[in-house]
């Protein structure tokens, strides 16, 4: 630093002592942060300009800074020990401070010797200038080595590089790949991801999978809000919230999602109006011609047809496409949000359980549509068949990290098993090798003739990489209690039932269905066809307009609603919920019941609002099965459940000794459980003899006829 000090003294002989100390301090403490002369000019150039008065212009100040920068670079090896370095991973201070006594006093910090003779006013003025400069700089440089960003209760921190920052700010970064390295994501005091990396290559379709509650939805939100840094030139859309209802027709709402087209059309109308009114100044005609060329380039005239095809594929009839958005229910507005995202075609499309809002027909259409998607997709889904149809890669979230796999979900399962097997083999082989070396060390530790060999073996042990045993995910087990006596049919039936809310719109006409304790019936059909209405008729929650509902006197039905979350008190814990619903039992019984569905330990005592969607579903299952029903009616039970839980639910239903009727859109779950397939359509229910294969073939043929494929 003496050389830099000499440069300052020689170039600015009149420099104030306090300012001199201040500048040399900045140069010393920030030397590792100056990656170019521009950084140094930005840090102290303005201050040196004030010191020089009129004796040096900008070029002169820059020349001085260049000399000091060269000196700092030459001195770099000597100052390396004090330089700032990029951490291997972001550090959580809360984890470090847990090891310290909060009551510890640090006298060196509390009472510091005041030996400085610097003029307080001058120092204050200099520090104010530096603070203003640093604030200005921090606005430009958003890439710091650990930058906490908060989204509701979630936060993220990540390492960054100045090189990427400069490419981004200069506009030279033209890549549409998304690469985020070495980041953490936390939710409250829980670490969801630690030192994780995610790489999304342009044009590939990624399925994000993992157990409930590990942070998949939180990760999507971090990307959507750019709390995890996605390059600014990459457009992204996160289908999370339903479209707000107003008087805009559904089709127009979708068209408006293309902001480029809308801006061009708006400007076209303005220019046309000016020319028609005689207010044109001469340049309007040329601008209008340019706008027409751009509209033709983006095929603006074909946009309404493309939007209509998307809406039709998602189940909107021509009449519905012209309805105001305020007339749609929440589920249909979510479909509308998905349609807008598909129409807008962002560079990165983020989807969180898109199949939850769709029926089987719409899911099959979406599978076909996404297979030709031109840009990048990251989708959270627990629908195995959906991921097999659309995913080119799988990202597995587990153990606070992300592992990437090439291929669809079935390929991922095989690759993961092979990877775990290889990891276990490597771990066991190293353990044997370590043990072999340790035996030698223990045997000859006190043998002077073997001392050098023992030391060599100890160094070998130190150099071995630390391999950890394979972290296997626990198996999910669910069981429906069935300690009841069987009884003879008829168990549950609807006979010649008519039902409607409005006589002008009959939902069912002469409906006749029946089920017994051996039944495993799955109901499918388009949204609005009456699936949930039929379930409520079977439950007895709705009374037929005509016809009869018959239920056995010993029948005890357990009902799972697709809107179960809305029926839970989210301010209480799972244990409190069961205690209120079934009072008078010991807490151990409530905990045991919840444990059957994977809600154990502190999870059972946390407010339901803090649980993931899948965990709330498990609580709803625990509540539903507490009275030991002998028949279950389930409306979309797999929504929000992870794949392992869906598999466990399927096994539990197959082992259950009572009857089951369920509505589902999950193809694998239907194939796992279903013995009968009912299709709701045209005011009635049809039994499909060929099962789901026949139903899928019928839908594919319908798509071909309607031109969707």
From Swiss-Prot:
Residues 129-171 are annotated as: Disordered. Residues 178-424, 492-707 form the ABC transporter domain. SMART domains: AAA (SM00382). Displays an antiviral effect against flaviviruses such as west Nile virus (WNV) in the presence of OAS1B. GO terms for molecular function: ATP binding; ATP hydrolysis activity; cadherin binding. Keywords: Acetylation, Antiviral defense, ATP-binding, Nucleotide-binding, Phosphoprotein, Repeat. This is ATP-binding cassette sub-family F member 3. The gene is ABCF3. ATP 1 binds at residues 210-217. InterPro entries: AAA+_ATPase, ABC_tran_Xtn, ABC_transporter-like_ATP-bd, ABC_transporter-like_CS, ABCF_EF3_subfamily, P-loop_NTPase. ATP 2 binds at residues 525-532. The modification Phosphoserine is found at residues 83, 155, 157, 161, 283. GO terms for biological process: defense response to virus. GO terms for cellular component: membrane. It comes from the Eukaryota. The modification N-acetylalanine is found at residue 2. Belongs to the ABC transporter superfamily. ABCF family. EF3 subfamily. The keyword Acetylation applies. Residues 129-143, 161-171 have a biased composition (Basic and acidic residues). PANTHER family: ATP-BINDING CASSETTE SUB-FAMILY F MEMBER 3 (PTHR19211:SF117), ATP-BINDING TRANSPORT PROTEIN-RELATED (PTHR19211).
């Amino acid at each position: 630093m003496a050389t830099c000090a000499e440069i300052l003294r020689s170039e600015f002989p009149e420099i104030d002592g306090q300012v001199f100390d201040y500048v040399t301090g900045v140069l010393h403490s920030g030397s590792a942060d100056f990656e170019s002369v521009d950084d140094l000019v930005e840090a102290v150039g303005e201050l040196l300009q004030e010191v020089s008065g009129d004796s040096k212009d900008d070029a002169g100040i820059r020349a001085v800074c260049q000399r000091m920068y060269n000196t700092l670079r030459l001195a770099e090896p000597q100052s390396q020990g004090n330089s700032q370095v990029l951490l291997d991973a972001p550090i959580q201070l809360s984890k470090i401070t847990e090891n310290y006594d909060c009551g510890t006093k640090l006298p060196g910090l509390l009472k510091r010797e005041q030996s400085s003779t610097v003029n307080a006013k001058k120092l204050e003025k200099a520090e104010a200038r530096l603070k203003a400069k640093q604030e200005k700089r921090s606005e430009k440089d958003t890439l710091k080595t650990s930058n906490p960003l908060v989204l509701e209760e979630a936060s993220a921190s990540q390492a960054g590089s100045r090189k990427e920052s400069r490419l981004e700010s200069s506009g030279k970064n033209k890549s549409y790949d998304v690469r985020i390295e070495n980041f953490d994501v936390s939710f409250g005091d829980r670490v969801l991801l630690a030192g994780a990396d995610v790489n999304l290559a342009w044009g590939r379709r990624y399925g994000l999978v993992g157990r409930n509650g590990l942070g998949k939805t939180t990760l999507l939100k971090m990307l959507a809000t750019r709390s995890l840094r996605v390059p600014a030139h990459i457009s992204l859309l996160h289908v999370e919230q339903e479209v707000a209802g107003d008087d805009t027709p559904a089709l127009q709402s979708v068209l408006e999602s293309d902001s480029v087209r809308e801006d061009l059309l708006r400007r076209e109308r303005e220019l046309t109006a000016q020319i028609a009114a005689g207010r044109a100044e001469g340049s309007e005609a040329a601008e209008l011609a340019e706008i027409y060329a751009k509209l033709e380039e983006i095929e603006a005239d074909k946009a309404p047809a493309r939007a209509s095809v998307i809406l039709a594929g998602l189940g909107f009839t021509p009449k519905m496409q012209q309805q105001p958005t305020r007339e749609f229910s929440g589920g249909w507005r979510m479909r509308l949000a998905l349609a807008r995202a598909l129409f807008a075609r962002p560079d990165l499309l983020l989807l969180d359980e898109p199949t939850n809002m769709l029926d089987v027909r719409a899911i099959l259409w979406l599978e076909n549509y996404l297979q030709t998607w031109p840009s990048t997709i990251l989708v959270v889904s627990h629908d195995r068949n959906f991921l097999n149809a659309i995913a080119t890669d799988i990202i597995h979230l587990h153990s606070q990290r992300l592992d990437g796999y090439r291929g669809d979900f079935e390929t991922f399962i095989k690759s993961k098993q092979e990877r775990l097997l290889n990891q276990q083999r490597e771990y066991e082989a190293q353990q044997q090798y370590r043990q072999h070396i340790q035996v030698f060390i223990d045997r000859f530790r006190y043998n002077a003739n073997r001392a050098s060999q023992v030391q060599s073996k100890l160094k070998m042990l130190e150099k071995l990489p630390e391999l950890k045993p394979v972290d296997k995910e626990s198996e999910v087990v669910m069981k429906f209690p069935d300690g009841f006596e069987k009884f003879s049919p008829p168990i549950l039936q609807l006979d010649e039932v008519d039902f409607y809310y409005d006589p002008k719109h009959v939902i069912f006409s002469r409906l006749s269905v029946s089920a017994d304790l051996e039944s495993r019936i799955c109901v499918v059909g388009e949204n609005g066809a009456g699936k949930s209405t039929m379930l409520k008729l079977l439950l007895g929650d709705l009374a037929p307009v005509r016809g009869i509902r018959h239920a056995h006197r010993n029948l005890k039905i357990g009902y799972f609603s697709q809107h179960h979350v809305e029926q839970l008190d989210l301010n209480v814990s799972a244990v409190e919920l069961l205690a209120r619903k079934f009072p008078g039992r010991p807490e151990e019984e409530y905990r045991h019941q919840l444990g059957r569905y994977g809600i154990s330990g502190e999870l059972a005592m946390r407010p339901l609002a803090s649980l993931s969607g899948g965990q709330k579903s498990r609580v709803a299952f625990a509540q539903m099965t507490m009275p030991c029903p002998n028949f279950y009616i389930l409306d979309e039970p797999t929504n929000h459940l992870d794949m392992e839980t869906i598999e466990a639910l399927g096994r539990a239903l197959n082992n259950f000794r009572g009857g089951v009727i369920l509505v589902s859109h999950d193809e694998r779950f239907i194939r796992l459980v279903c013995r009968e397939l009912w299709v709701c359509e045209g005011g009635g229910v049809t039994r499909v003899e060929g099962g789901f294969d026949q139903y899928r073939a019928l839908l594919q043929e319908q798509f071909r006829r309607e031109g969707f494929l």
